[in-house]
UniProtKB/Swiss-Prot annotation:
One of its GO terms (molecular function) is protein-glutamine N-methyltransferase activity. The keyword Nucleotide-binding does not apply. Belongs to the protein N5-glutamine methyltransferase family. PrmC subfamily. Substrate binds at N190, P191, P192, Y193. This is Release factor glutamine methyltransferase. S-adenosyl-L-methionine binds at G123, T124, G125, S126, G127, D146, N190. Transmembrane segments: none annotated. Pfam families: MTS (PF05175), PrmC_N (PF17827). It comes from Bacillus subtilis (strain 168). GO terms for biological process: methylation; translational termination.
Length: 288
C-alpha cells in the first residue's frame, strides 16, 4: 500500500465488507492527509506518508468498530456550516436542517411586526439549531439550553467559531427561563424522542456511540413533549410559535398533546424529504 489511491481502495473495500458506508474512507483520508478533496483526487498516484498511513489505518479500524466518522474527525456540516462535534453531543442530521428550514420559512406568517424575537433552542447539543438561527436571521435574539455542561461547551465553542451571538444556559428544558422570568416568542427543540422499543432498530453506530440521554427518554418517546405542555405557558408571551422535531410515528400523538393542552392552537405536521412526519409547527395563543 504505497499510494494514496491504494490506501483509499483498501479502506473502501474493508469498510464496505464490515457494513460501513464506503464514503467514510474518503472522509477519513481527507482528515488524515489534511488535503482538500480536489487536491486529494489530483494526488491519488502519489505516495502516502508513513505517519499519515498509520493514522489512517487506526481511524479506519475505529470506524469499523462502530465509532462514527464525525466523532473521529471532530466535525459535521449543518446548513452549510462546519460544526465541531464529539461524543458529548448528537451528530447533526439532515432531518434537523429541515426543521430549521421550516422555522425560518413559517415564522414570518406569525410575526409580521418588526423588532427582535426571543428564540429559545431547548436541548441544544452541539448548538447547530441555535447557531444557525442566529446567523440566518438577525431579528432573532437566540438563547440555548442544555442539561449537559459538556454539550454546552461544544455549543459555545461552535457559536464562537462561527461568530454567532447566542446566550447559553444550563438546565432542564425551559427551567432556566422559568426561574429567570424570561419570555419567548419562538421555542424550538429536537428532544430525545426515540422510544425504548425503537432503540433496538437503530444502527449500532448510533446506539452505542452517541449520547443515550439525547436519543431516548427510556419510554414511549413522548415524555419531553408532555413536559413542554406544562412549561410553555410559563414562558410564552401573548403568543408563541413552537417548532419540534419528532419521530416519524409521532405526528398524530404530539399534535394531539398540543391541541389538548392549548385550546385553539394551530398545529401543522410536516414531512421530511423521505415523506415521513418530522416537524411539528404550532401557533399557540395565551388567551384562547
Amino acid at each position: 500500500m504505497k499510494t494514496i489511491f491504494e490506501a483509499l481502495k483498501w479502506a473502501s473495500s474493508y469498510l464496505t465488507e464490515a457494513g460501513r458506508e464506503e464514503n467514510a474512507a474518503e472522509l477519513l483520508l481527507l482528515y488524515d492527509t489534511g488535503m482538500e478533496r480536489s487536491k486529494l483526487l489530483a494526488s491519488l498516484q502519489e505516495p502516502i506518508g508513513e505517519d499519515e498511513l498509520y493514522r489512517f489505518k487506526r481511524h479506519v479500524e475505529m470506524h469499523k468498530e462502530g465509532v462514527p466518522v464525525q466523532y473521529i474527525i471532530g466535525k459535521e456540516f449543518f446548513y452549510g456550516r462546519e460544526f465541531m462535534v464529539n461524543d458529548d453531543v448528537l451528530i447533526p442530521r439532515p432531518e434537523t436542517e429541515e426543521v430549521v428550514f421550516h422555522l425560518l420559512e413559517k415564522y414570518r406568517s406569525v410575526f409580521s411586526e418588526d423588532g427582535k424575537l426571543e428564540v429559545v433552542d431547548v436541548g441544544t447539543g452541539s448548538g447547530a439549531i441555535a447557531v444557525t438561527l442566529a446567523l440566518e436571521n438577525q431579528s432573532f435574539s437566540v438563547s440555548a439550553v442544555d442539561i449537559s455542561k459538556e454539550a454546552l461547551q461544544v455549543a459555545s465553542a461552535n457559536a464562537e467559531k462561527l461568530g454567532a451571538n447566542v446566550r447559553f444556559y444550563q438546565g432542564d428544558l425551559l427551567e432556566p427561563f422559568i426561574k429567570a422570568g424570561k419570555k419567548a416568542d419562538i421555542i424550538v427543540s429536537n428532544p430525545p424522542y426515540i422510544s425504548e422499543e425503537e432503540m433496538a432498530d437503530l444502527s449500532e453506530i448510533v446506539r452505542f456511540h452517541e449520547p443515550l440521554h439525547a436519543l431516548t427518554d427510556g419510554g414511549d418517546g413522548l415524555k419531553f413533549y408532555k413536559r413542554f405542555m406544562e412549561d410553555i405557558p410559563l414562558v410564552m408571551k401573548d403568543k408563541v410559535f413552537v417548532v419540534f422535531e419528532i419521530g416519524w410515528k409521532q405526528g398524530a400523538a404530539v399534535k394531539d398533546l398540543i391541541l389538548k393542552a392549548f385550546k385553539g392552537a394551530e398545529v401543522e405536521v410536516l414531512k421530511d424529504i423521505n415523506g415521513k412526519d418530522r416537524t411539528i409547527c404550532a401557533l399557540i395563543h395565551k388567551n384562547k
